[in-house]
């Protein structure tokens, strides 16, 4: 019997909400609540509907961001494109149907598509004057890892990410161990899993990262960034012999995974997680006990652990 998983983003939402559908924020969030302006990333440029998927991947890779706003000619936010939208389009989900309908066979054709055809329209975004607790409430309710921010006159101003929020909220000692907030159900692949299957798992199960485990031994980690970097750095053109989409989807996880995986103990303090994530420039850590992967902890887990009762 096949187990049907609830996408992680939905489990996370339910985990941190009260019965009335609102998060129960700790007093420390209100006492330290800042203006959004110092927290937003202004270095992530917007794109327009005619920007190609390739150019979008280049920006995501170079700017280390998984969300880019799509703006109108006047600078208003009209859509967003995320790394997972691109993974979906490349073979992970419903957006891939556009490839079949268009008859694309080469990776060049696939990556030359305008993002306007796969972006999310009418996106959730916040005004620069929105209180942080309201932003967090939105992020929790909708499972968002980043949101575009508009200026007072509704012009794109930047992006607010979980990483920037975590940086602000981090303190020297929290007193909450990793095992209290980590996700225990770790979905994994093996090193011979095809990229097509791994992308399908990411989209259908609502995860952005998959540990790679062979015979109970941790071999690496496959993340959205591995896929985006493969394209954004143009390495994809070096490893595909004929430049065909089917070659790309047939790649093995081991061809692009990260082998140097950052780990942490289940008894470590949340503050140690924040420090390790910032130091390693990653978005998650695997939780390992006596050589066995027992969980995973992300920027989102740290934030919620810090501010939600």
Question: Whereabouts are the PLM-identified features?
Answer:
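Tandem CBS (Cystathionine beta-synthase) repeat/Bateman regulatory domains
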Residues: 1-309
């Amino acid at each position: 019997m096949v187990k049907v998983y609830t996408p992680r983003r939905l489990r996370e939402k339910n985990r941190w909400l009260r019965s009335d559908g609102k998060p129960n924020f700790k007093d420390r969030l209100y006492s330290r609540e800042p203006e959004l302006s110092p927290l937003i990333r202004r270095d992530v440029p917007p794109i327009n509907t005619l920007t190609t998927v390739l150019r979008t991947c280049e920006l995501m890779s170079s700017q280390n961001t998984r969300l880019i706003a799509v703006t109108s000619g006047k600078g208003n936010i009209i859509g967003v494109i995320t790394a997972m939208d691109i993974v979906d389009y490349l073979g992970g989900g419903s957006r891939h149907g556009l490839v079949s309908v268009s008859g694309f066979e080469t990776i060049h054709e696939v990556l030359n598509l305008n993002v306007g055809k796969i972006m999310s329209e009418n996106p959730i975004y916040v005004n620069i004057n929105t209180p942080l607790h309201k932003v967090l409430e939105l992020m929790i309710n909708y499972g968002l890892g980043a949101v575009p921010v508009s200026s007072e006159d509704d012009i794109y101003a930047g992006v607010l990410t979980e990483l920037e929020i975590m940086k602000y909220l981090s303190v020297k000692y929290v007193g909450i161990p990793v095992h209290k907030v980590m996700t225990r159900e770790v979905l994994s692949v093996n090193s011979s899993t095809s990229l097509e299957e791994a992308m399908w798992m990411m989209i259908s199960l609502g995860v952005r990262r998959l540990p790679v485990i062979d015979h109970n031994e941790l071999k690496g980690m496959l993340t959205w960034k591995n896929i985006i970097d493969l394209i954004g750095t143009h390495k994809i053109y070096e490893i595909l012999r004929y430049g065909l989409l089917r070659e790309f989807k047939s790649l093995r996880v081991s061809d692009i995974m990260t082998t140097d995986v950052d780990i942490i103990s289940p008894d470590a303090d949340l503050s140690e997680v924040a420090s390790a994530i910032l130091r390693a420039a990653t978005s998650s850590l695997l939780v390992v006990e006596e050589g066995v992967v027992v969980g995973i902890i992300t920027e989102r887990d740290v934030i919620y652990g810090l501010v939600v009762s």
